[in-house]
């Protein structure tokens, strides 16, 4: 589908792998110019000359200002901001999560988005238009006990997006969320990653454990975990003028988890 994104300037955080990398690929296919921010943005930077890869730690307080300033220096505008960067550490219990761990997770998952929005919004307002798409999660609505701080951070993202949509809609800025369910990013397949953890938990081979997780544990109506491309396409839709009357929304890309809850 033509999302009418040719020459749009798109900033994507966490663009180096998983959903962020798939989103970069999707925007490039639509003709956009991408600024890819990540600790290691090399995979995104190798995709095309239309990608400006910025190696940056989005959890640092000045990272967002730097990324947006570089975007303005290179392109003179910012049309789309995709808040994607984040981590989802497994927690044995709420009681096992220290203050330091709470602060670290919230700083990366939530405050990075706060700072990125604050840096990008003045330019979008001056332009009279802009689109912000923030990646939340199905557990932002229905928390997972093993990802307690992650769940809270994504609930906060949902409210941040809605608040921005209300205040800045009159200025021509739209703000929406995409809430993925289980999505098979590299974190599932790296040694010692989520796939191996599931295999150890259920006493199965990794592929069988992932299938069991989807069908029997999370009970996805579609009975399989999603792919990063599934999420990326919805992000591109929400960033485009095809969705010009959509703001303050949360699109679930979860295989039916929320519907079945």
Regions found by a protein language model. Give the residues of each.
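Active-site helix of classical SDR
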Residues: 117, 153, 161
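Short, small/polar-rich loop/turn modules that mediate ligand/substrate recognition or access, typified
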Residues: 169, 174, 246-248
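C-terminal helical subdomain
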Residues: 177, 200-242, 246, 255
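Short C-terminal tail/terminal secondary-structure segment
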Residues: 88-91, 142, 235-236, 247-261
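Substrate-binding pocket helix/loop in short-chain dehydrogenase/reductase
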Residues: 92-94, 98-103, 216
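Alpha-helical segment proximal to the catalytic Tyr-Lys
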Residues: 122, 166-167, 244
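Residue(s) in the substrate-gating loop at a strand-loop-helix junction
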Residues: 137
């Amino acid at each position: 589908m033509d999302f009418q994104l040719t020459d749009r300037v798109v900033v994507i955080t966490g663009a180096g792998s998983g959903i962020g990398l798939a989103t970069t690929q999707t925007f490039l296919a639509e003709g956009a110019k991408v600024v890819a921010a990540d600790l290691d943005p090399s995979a995104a930077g190798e995709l095309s000359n239309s990608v400006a890869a910025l190696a940056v730690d989005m959890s640092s307080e000045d990272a967002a200002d730097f990324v947006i300033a570089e975007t303005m220096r290179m392109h003179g505008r910012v049309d789309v901001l995709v808040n994607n960067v984040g981590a989802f550490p497994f927690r044995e219990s709420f009681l096992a999560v220290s203050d330091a761990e709470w602060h670290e997770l919230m700083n990366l998952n939530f405050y990075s988005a706060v700072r990125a929005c604050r840096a990008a919004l003045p330019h979008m307002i001056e332009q009279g238009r802009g689109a912000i798409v923030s990646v939340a999660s199905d557990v932002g609505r229905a928390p997972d006990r093993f990802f307690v701080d992650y769940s809270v951070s994504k609930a906060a993202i949902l409210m941040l997006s809605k608040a921005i949509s209300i205040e800045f809609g009159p200025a021509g800025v739209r703000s929406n969320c995409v809430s993925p369910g289980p999505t098979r990013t590299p974190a599932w397949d790296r040694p010692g990653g989520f796939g191996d953890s599931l295999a150890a938990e259920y006493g199965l081979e990794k592929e069988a454990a992932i299938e069991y997780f989807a069908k029997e544990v999370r009970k996805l109506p579609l009975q399989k975990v999603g792919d990063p491309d599934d999420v990326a396409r919805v992000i591109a839709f929400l960033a485009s003028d095809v969705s010009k009357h959509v703001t303050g929304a949360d699109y679930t890309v979860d295989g039916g988890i929320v519907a079945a809850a």
